[in-house]
């Protein structure tokens, strides 16, 4: 066999092995990530213990990033069409911001209401890149109803296929129907962002 042809076939064999390894690694990753890959259409909620267990497992995956942003006590609610509302930008890790065009495979945003929020109190929570004003009986299409129950985490978003630049523009919106219960300058919720990005599929993640 001529050396050039042999080199070509050897290179193709290496590429095929690398592709199979990537597919196996990503399939394993998908299984590991299944606890958080819930879409908003199902209005999911899960126990906070399940989320933290998944988080501790996912931290071991190369390329995986988790960050946390808190609705701080200085948050002042405003009123809009009869609703108490609040919003906060997402805090995106600097390591991701250095690659604004990096494509995201999965994003899950988990909301945990502050334990001081009464269990009977009701919120609607949404994530988006622009303000969509709620009206009586009507909320943004991706808004999820959550209640003030300690220990409950709510996955409100699963948004594949966008870039880090888009993620940095997203804001978390909270709508509350009872302004008096929440009051001004109240802690409301902690939000965690789980991100899996395309670097996981690159060569450095191929198992040897």
Curated annotation (Swiss-Prot):
Subcellular compartments: Virion
Signal peptide: none
Domain of life according to the entry: Viruses
Primary location group: virion
Keywords from the UniProt entry: Capsid protein, Ribonucleoprotein, RNA-binding, T=3 icosahedral capsid protein, Viral nucleoprotein, Virion
Biased composition annotated in UniProt, kind: Basic residues: 13-22
Segments for region (Disordered): 1-23
GO CC term, one of those recorded: T=3 icosahedral viral capsid
UniProt feature, compositional bias: Basic and acidic residues: 1-12
GO MF terms held by the record: RNA binding
RNA-binding as UniProt keyword: yes
Function text: Capsid protein self-assembles to form a quasi spherical capsid, about 25-35 nm.
Protein name as catalogued: Capsid protein
């Amino acid at each position: 066999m001529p050396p050039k042809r042999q080199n070509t076939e050897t290179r193709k064999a290496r590429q095929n092995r690398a592709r199979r390894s990537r597919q196996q690694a990503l399939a394993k990753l998908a299984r590991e990530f299944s606890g958080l890959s819930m879409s908003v259409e199902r209005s999911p909620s899960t126990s906070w213990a399940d989320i933290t267990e998944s988080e501790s497992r996912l931290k071991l995956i190369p390329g995986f990033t988790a960050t946390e942003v808190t609705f701080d006590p200085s948050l002042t609610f405003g009123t809009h069409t009869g609703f108490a509302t609040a919003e906060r930008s997402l805090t995106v890790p600097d390591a991701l911001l250095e690659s604004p065009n990096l494509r995201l495979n999965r994003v899950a945003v988990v909301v945990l209401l502050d334990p001081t929020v009464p269990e009977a109190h009701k919120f609607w929570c949404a994530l988006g890149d622009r303000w969509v004003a709620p009206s009586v009986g009507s909320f943004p299409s991706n808004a999820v109803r959550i209640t003030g129950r300690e220990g409950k985490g709510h996955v409100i978003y699963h948004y594949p296929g966008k870039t880090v630049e888009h993620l940095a523009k997203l804001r978390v919106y909270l709508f509350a129907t009872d302004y008096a219960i929440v009051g001004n300058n109240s802690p409301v919720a902690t939000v965690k962002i789980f991100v899996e990005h395309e670097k996981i599929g690159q060569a450095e993640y191929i198992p040897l």
